[in-house]
A protein has these predicted regions:
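A surface-exposed partner-binding patch
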Residues: 1-92, 158-184
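Long, low-complexity, intrinsically disordered segments enriched in glycines and aromatic residues
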Residues: 39-152
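Protein C-terminal end segments and domain termini
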Residues: 150, 154-160
Length: 184
């Protein structure tokens, strides 16, 4: 799995989070939070058996896409799990936090009341069952570079203001993104 991490976490952040909510996180997941503190995972798919889901984000601590912010919408006490990420459609991935399910990863479909559907016995297994594609160089090219490419290919008639706006948004989103392989 490739991730554009939110920055390094710290053992202090993780321990403070665990104390605040009275939970103990799986050791591998703790190491993940310390090393990456979550991040964006564009072009990432989790596949295991017949299950196939996009993975858009893995949440971190004290960042925009945070575990705590998403706990507000997710009945984590009832589910004995906390939200750790999301797919492209607003569904959650969660990780077990009780003695009986610690470290188990679930898919939580919002159309099914966020019911826990087990997809991996461990967070490490979840990471290993994902596949990511690198963000293409085209996605990182400027509007001007894209226009020049279409004109060179005789397709200038396809260029519209709407397309330029789409390109501009994509460029701004991906121009500085750095993806790295998540530890296994």
């Amino acid at each position: 799995m490739l991730i554009a991490k939110y920055g390094n976490g710290s053992i202090e952040q993780v321990e403070e989070f665990e104390r605040k909510y009275g939970i103990n996180l799986d050791e591998y997941y703790r190491k993940f939070l310390i090393k990456y503190n979550g991040g964006e995972t564009p072009n990432t798919i989790f596949r295991k058996g017949k299950v196939s889901e996009t993975v858009r984000y893995l949440y971190g601590l004290n960042v925009e896409q945070s575990i705590e912010k998403n706990m507000i919408y997710f009945d984590w006490r009832k589910n004995n799990s906390i939200p750790i990420g999301a797919d492209n459609f607003g569904n959650y991935f969660s990780i077990g936090i009780s003695e009986n399910n610690n470290g188990i990863v679930y898919f939580c479909d919002h159309e099914r009341g966020f019911k826990n559907i087990k997809i991996s016995d461990t967070f490490q297994g979840f990471v290993e069952a994902t596949h990511s594609e690198m963000i293409s160089d085209f996605a990182k090219s400027t509007v001007e570079e894209r226009e020049a490419r279409l004109i060179a290919n005789g397709k200038e008639h396809n260029i519209t203001d709407g397309l330029r706006n789409l390109w501009r948004k994509e460029y701004e989103k991906y121009k500085d993104i750095f993806q790295e392989e998540v530890m296994k």
